Amino acid sequence: KSLINMMNPRVNKKLIDVACGTGDIGKLFLDNTNKEAEITCVDPNKGMIGQGKQKLSNYNNIKWFISPAEKLPFADNTFDYYTISFGLRNTKNLNKALSEAHRVLKPGGRYLCLEFSKIQNSNLDFIYKNYSKLIPIIGQFVVGEKEPYDYLIKSIEQFINQDELMDLMEKNSF
């Protein structure tokens, strides 16, 4: 919700939500514009798109596409807002994903990213690393699955740090 507030959504604007999952960001955006905006939800996972279509079937102005972030099937300068939530670290080519984001955004468009990354403060990193060992155990206990939480921790550890991401974003004209 804070992400949506940061965007200050306006009616008649176009949002692309990449790695959209089941469309929660698009729904929140529409709910804040009285459903007077165009939403494009993109995810490489056909199952997530199917669940999103079903869940948000009463939202007529959401278009759904199966596509990776690195190869978006849209013209240059199409969208006013580009969002990606917890999906950037899962792209196969981070540089290409950022390049595509810049390409499809209109001049002056806004790129908003929610993502986990490595902690750069050594004191906090020590706490995080110990806590992160518990997350898969908690996942096993609460939902009966450990593997997705193992993957989450591993993907965060393998992702670049915040400074490296900022450098890469600057190289892609953000």
Predicted regions and their residues:
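Conserved alpha-helix/loop element of class I SAM-dependent methyltransferases that forms part
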Residues: 1-13, 28
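A structural alpha-helix within SAM-dependent methyltransferase catalytic domains
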Residues: 4, 27-30, 98-102
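Class I SAM-dependent methyltransferase SAM/SAH-binding core
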Residues: 14-71
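C-terminal alpha-helical "lid/dimerization" subdomain adjacent to the S-adenosyl-L-methionine
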Residues: 42, 114, 118-168, 172
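A short acidic, Gly/Pro-enriched loop at the edge of an enzyme's catalytic core
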Residues: 70-82
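A short SAM/SAH-binding and catalytic strip from SAM-dependent methyltransferases
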Residues: 80-94
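A short glycine-rich, Lys/Arg-flanked "PGG" loop and its adjoining helix->strand segment in the class I
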Residues: 95-110
